[in-house]
Amino acid sequence: MLRLGVNIDHVATIRNARGSSYPEPVRAAELALAAGADGITAHLREDRRHISDADIALLTDLCLKRGKPLNFEMAVTDEMVGIALQARPHAACLVPERREEVTTEGGLDVVKGFDKIAAATARLRTAGARVSLFIEADPAQIQASADAGAQVVELHTGAYCDAAREGHADRAAAILERLKTGAELAASLGLEVHAGHGIDYATVKPIAAIPQIAELNIGHFLIGEAIFVGLPQAMQRMRVLMDAARLEVAA
């Protein structure tokens, strides 16, 4: 079954907007797991704009108690590798990070940063973390990810979702085809394939229909929708669409 990882970063965004102690990301994570999330994703950014070090400690403890994986998103820096080695999350997803960006704007350039990424990957794997690289569906990046020692690639779906939402059908179709080809290549290299960024109800099914994808990581949309309908209900509808896409492919 296609897995759903729930990113709870933007619960922390709401909390930090008032400099308060609530809403608590760990409470959102607990609700998500109770509602059937297959794992929790959290991004500890260098500027700590949403998730904090304390959140990571609480989320690590929660996921261990619930027997579910924590996917720790992190920049490729010595500081973040050190934090990950101490927290020992189930998975570490290396992502690009620029302080001036509002959200992650694209995939990690594994080709350009190969030596640094390979070294971080080796350190994390030695500590028992399952290492994922967040990349574009580009053949060179996928091959470099395998060469760097990653076990997983997470394909960046943001460009597809933006094109589809904006009504650029031809562009969306071309990007979707690249995602399909990239997923096939990654799987052929022995990499587990995940996907994420920008996914909502309108865009999830074409992505979920790609058979090589094992997991979708969705956050901003689910947290936004939860304001209106509640997190379990938002997740349930997403899960229905994901499962329907897989059933349609099987049929």
UniProtKB/Swiss-Prot annotation:
- Marked site: Transition state stabilizer: E154
State a single Gene Ontology molecular function: pyridoxine 5'-phosphate synthase activity
Q: Which GO terms describe its biological process?
A: pyridoxine biosynthetic process
**Keywords associated with the record:** Cytoplasm, Pyridoxine biosynthesis, Transferase
* Origin superkingdom: Bacteria
Q: Pathway it acts in? A: Cofactor biosynthesis; pyridoxine 5'-phosphate biosynthesis; pyridoxine 5'-phosphate from D-erythrose 4-phosphate: step 5/5
Kindly name one Pfam family recorded for this protein: PdxJ
What this protein catalyses is: 3-amino-2-oxopropyl phosphate + 1-deoxy-D-xylulose 5-phosphate = pyridoxine 5'-phosphate + phosphate + 2 H2O + H(+)
Catalytic activity, EC: 2.6.99.2
- Disulfide bonds, paired cysteine numbers: none
Say which enzyme class the record assigns: transferase
**UniProt feature coiled coil, ranges:** none
Where does it live in the cell?
Cytoplasm
* Residues noted as binding 1-deoxy-D-xylulose 5-phosphate in the record, renumbered to the chain: D9, H10, R45, H50, T103
GO CC term (a single one): cytosol
In which residues is 3-amino-2-oxopropyl phosphate bound?
A: N7, R18, G198, G219, H220
The record ties this protein, via CDD domains, to: PNPsynthase
Metal-binding as a keyword? no
The protein's job, in short, is: Catalyzes the complicated ring closure reaction between the two acyclic compounds 1-deoxy-D-xylulose-5-phosphate (DXP) and 3-amino-2-oxopropyl phosphate (1-amino-acetone-3-phosphate or AAP) to form pyridoxine 5'-phosphate (PNP) and inorganic phosphate.
Q: Which family does it belong to?
A: Belongs to the PNP synthase family.
Q: Quaternary structure?
A: Homooctamer; tetramer of dimers.
The protein's name is Pyridoxine 5'-phosphate synthase
